[in-house]
From Swiss-Prot:
Residues 197-210 have a biased composition (Polar residues). It is found in: Nucleus. The gene is mcmbp. It comes from Salmo salar. This is Mini-chromosome maintenance complex-binding protein. InterPro entries: MCM_complex-bd. Interacts with the mcm complex: associates with the mcm3-7 complex which lacks mcm2, while it does not interact with the mcm complex when mcm2 is present (mcm2-7 complex). Keywords: Cell cycle, Cell division, DNA replication, Mitosis, Nucleus. One of its GO terms (molecular function) is chromatin binding. Residues 177-196 have a biased composition (Basic and acidic residues). Associated component of the mcm complex that acts as a regulator of DNA replication. Binds to the MCM complex during late S phase and promotes the disassembly of the mcm complex from chromatin, thereby acting as a key regulator of pre-replication complex (pre-RC) unloading from replicated DNA. Can dissociate the mcm complex without addition of ATP; probably acts by destabilizing interactions of each individual subunits of the mcm complex. Required for sister chromatid cohesion. Belongs to the MCMBP family. GO terms for biological process: cell division; DNA-templated DNA replication; sister chromatid cohesion. One of its GO terms (cellular component) is nucleus.
């Protein structure tokens, strides 16, 4: 069997050895997968594998095992490759069967006339780092790694080091030549530059033109590698926008970037479909390997959450962790509520609703109705820099977030909805292509007077659909395709938001700091890292807890609602009942309670009454203004 390090440093050697021993047995491929899955189940073995998210590409050894924490941004058409091919040994002149799985190119000449060639099928996913991942989460993932890497010296680059922008410019200025930008070989050894940085201009440009190479990140200014992931098994188990931690064999062979007439026919046969692609498709589907490395998947772990402070679920470690943390849920909740109250200028009611919003989660769907969503509109927010600082504080609490400044220019120019580019045969990303449980902060205080153009109207409509139905309708030109999502949306506004929401809470500051920036900075700096980590664990854990309502409490709630309707038939509606049930659920989970009690229901009614009273009071004040 392979040594303890071979499966990480030389996984292809493991694969080829198993192929040589068992190629007559059709189950050899399953044995390979079982071997690697078995290795990755060993305690702490996941942390031994270097991560593309943390380690610059030039530090990683080609053909080694790496992992990549990512979102599936696009899924390309299936492709054919040479699963088994025959080569002629140049020294002995004997024919040798080779395995083509988990490879992009052949090592030596292929016998093109061999009857032993086996053509197989695989699919390519275009994967990007999880959009909006918070700096604290990235840092925590990096610190937990036990992988030891040194700069790779496997091969020397055959060109001068160049930036992403230069590669991008080359592709812009030579759009007519088939794969012309790739004629200079790229090696991972040329990456003395920062391999993991992409220019924000690639994502902020509102133009639909995709003739230039970009990394197609959903959010502007994002950094990190993009990968072409080759998938061999379990294709039906993956969906667009899945968040995964992929373990696979890294391929950055310079031959991948030698295109057009210079490409070796034998390597082309590893993917014969390439010869049928248009130049635009080739540019999108076969970017330089030094910019977009290939990753041949051996194992993929779905990420139920993206919080590095929590153990992976479901495991024994996770169950034990949850049990121990539940004991202190109530005390951590009290500390977090006090912190948020200070952040919201002394408004305890708004702080409680913000806490409930942060743990909300779409736990199921009934027909088209997403259950569990809790979009909060925090109105009456101070202008200037308050909302920006509020977002920065929320960003420190959640693993993934994004602030959309709803200025007129942004709404008219930014692409929120992903769109299919039929020329390049790829999905052009949009800012609403986000991972599940991302906190989306919509800053409506930035909206000024002016005219929304057709693009702006479409963007506002897309935001409304996201809030109301937790779905985004992707633009496929001839039709729209609906993609469900699970995004926590917080809207900050001066008055009532122009967007729908599940709950509006007018902010009532109890303090008026002379220097808002200094006030909020002082509050944040007063929190120790250990305390912030408790808050982060609390928010992620609360949304994963199971929840139920007993028949007894259900009957009590129904009777109570009937009495409320009798007392005030005009004001109390079925919508109010639904909102109070959502609030009651979130209140229970925020306490670490997985069932609704009578006290929990009464508490939900009480804070909803306070909120409605405040909202009515605010309406009266606004109507009396000249």
């Amino acid at each position: 069997m392979p040594s303890s390090h071979d499966w990480i440093n030389k996984p292809l050697g493991v694969v080829e050895a198993m192929f040589a021993q068992n190629n007559s047995n059709p189950e050899w491929e399953e044995k390979v997968l079982e071997y690697f899955r078995g290795q990755l189940k060993e305690k702490e073995s996941l942390s031994w594998v270097p991560s593309l998210n943390d380690v610059p590409l030039h530090y990683l050894k080609p053909n080694s095992l790496v992992k990549f924490r990512c979102l599936v941004q696009d899924m390309f058409d299936p492709e054919f490759y040479m699963g088994v091919y025959e080569t002629v040994d140049p020294s002995t002149k004997t024919n040798v069967l080779r395995c083509g799985k988990y490879k992009d190119v052949t090592e030596c000449g292929v016998d093109l006339n061999s009857r032993n060639t086996v053509t197989a099928e695989r699919q390519t996913f275009y994967c990007v780092p999880i959009p909006g991942e918070s700096p604290w989460a990235k840092e925590s993932y990096g610190c937990s790694s036990q992988a030891r890497v040194v700069p790779s010296t496997s091969y020397v680059p055959s060109r001068q080091k160049r930036s992403y922008e230069e590669d991008d410019d080359d592709m812009d200025t030579q759009p007519q030549k088939q794969r012309e930008p790739h004629t200079e070989p790229h090696g991972n050894g040329d990456s003395k530059r920062q391999e993991t940085e992409a220019p924000s201009s690639q994502t902020t440009a509102p133009s639909d033109c995709s003739s230039h190479l970009d990394l197609n990140f959903p959010l502007p200014g994002e950094r990190g590698p993009a990968c072409l992931v080759k998938v061999y098994e379990g294709l039906d188990s993956f969906k667009l926008n899945d968040t995964l931690e992929i373990y696979g064999i890294l391929s950055v062979n310079p031959v991948l970037t030698v295109l057009g007439e210079e490409k070796d026919p034998s390597s082309l046969l590893l993917n014969p479909s390439e010869s049928m692609e248009s130049p635009e498709e080739q540019r999108a589907h076969d970017p330089p390997a030094s910019l977009v490395p290939r990753l041949h998947m051996l194992y993929a772990r779905p990420l139920q959450h993206n919080n590095p402070l929590l153990p992976s679920a479901p495991t024994e470690d996770h169950s034990a962790f949850v049990s121990s943390f539940l004991v202190e849920m109530a005390s951590v909740r009290a500390e977090l509520l006090a912190y948020l109250t200070h952040v919201l200028l002394g408004d305890g009611l708004a702080a409680e609703y913000l806490l409930l919003h942060l743990i909300s989660n779409v736990y199921t769907r009934r027909d088209v109705l997403p259950l569990g969503k809790f979009t909060l509109n925090l109105s009456g927010c101070p202008l200037n820099s308050y909302t920006e600082r509020l977002y920065q504080i929320i960003q420190q609490l959640v693993p993934c977030s994004y602030r959309l400044s709803m200025s007129l220019h942004t709404m008219n120019s930014m692409r929120l909805v992903p769109k299919k580019d039929y020329v390049a045969n790829r999905l052009v990303s949009g800012a609403l292509q986000l991972a599940r449980n991302t906190s989306l902060f919509l800053d409506e205080t930035q909206l000024e007077q002016g005219q929304l153009d057709s693009s702006g109207v479409r963007n506002i409509t897309a935001l409304g659909n996201l809030i109301s139905w937790q779905k985004v309708d992707y633009d496929f030109s001839y039709h729209q395709m609906e993609f469900p999502c699970n995004i926590n949306v917080l809207v900050t506004s001066e008055g009532r938001s122009l967007l729908p929401s599940d709950c509006q809470v007018p902010l009532q500051p109890q303090v008026t700091p002379p220097n808002m920036e200094e006030y909020l900075t002082t509050i944040h700096m007063a929190q120790f890292t250990s305390q912030m980590n408790k808050f982060r664990v609390y928010l992620s854990l609360a949304r994963t807890l199971d929840y139920s309502i007993s028949d007894e409490v259900t009957k009590a709630v129904e009777d109570d609602f009937v009495d409320m309707r009798k007392d005030d038939p005009q004001s109390v509606t079925a919508e109010d009942l639904h909102r109070m049930l959502v609030v009651a659920r979130l209140l229970s989970l925020s306490m670490g309670q997985t069932t609704l009690s009578r006290d929990g229901w009464m508490r939900a009614k009480h804070i909803d009454m306070l909120r409605r009273s405040r909202t009515e009071q605010q309406k009266s004040l606004n109507s009396n203004e000249p």
